[in-house]
């Protein structure tokens, strides 16, 4: 269910603006999206896992807040991010 450190490092490298950039909204959204996708796959086999579902909803909400922030600050950056991640809006 969680992402491997290698995959996390790959996402950071792919979405970071510069070296060592782990806290930018783009990186945070990319990591959250990966975790959300993994949890969604988990629910295909464990439909009644309500404790994990709550965590999923919290992650989706946090991602939504970060995306709203990016959209408010820079519309072009927001559109580029959602197209790269394949998030529909």
Swiss-Prot record:
Protein name: Small ribosomal subunit protein uS15
PROSITE patterns reported in the protein's UniProt record: RIBOSOMAL_S15
SUPFAM superfamilies tied to this protein: S15/NS1 RNA-binding domain
GO cellular component, one term: cytosolic small ribosomal subunit
GO MF annotation: an example: structural constituent of ribosome
Summary of subunit composition and partner proteins: Part of the 30S ribosomal subunit. Forms a bridge to the 50S subunit in the 70S ribosome, contacting the 23S rRNA.
Single GO biological process annotation from the record: translation
Record-stated family: Belongs to the universal ribosomal protein uS15 family.
Species of provenance: Parvibaculum lavamentivorans (strain DS-1 / DSM 13023 / NCIMB 13966)
Lineage: Bacteria, Pseudomonadati, Pseudomonadota, Alphaproteobacteria, Hyphomicrobiales
Domain of life per record: Bacteria
PANTHER family hit by this protein: RIBOSOMAL PROTEIN S15, BACTERIAL AND ORGANELLAR, SMALL RIBOSOMAL SUBUNIT PROTEIN US15M
InterPro entries attached to this UniProt entry: Ribosomal_uS15 (IPR000589), Ribosomal_uS15_bac-type (IPR005290), uS15_NS1_RNA-bd_sf (IPR009068)
The entry's keywords: Ribonucleoprotein, Ribosomal protein, RNA-binding, rRNA-binding
HAMAP family assigned to the protein according to its UniProt record, in alphabetical order: Ribosomal_uS15_B (MF_01343_B)
Task performed by this protein: One of the primary rRNA binding proteins, it binds directly to 16S rRNA where it helps nucleate assembly of the platform of the 30S subunit by binding and bridging several RNA helices of the 16S rRNA.
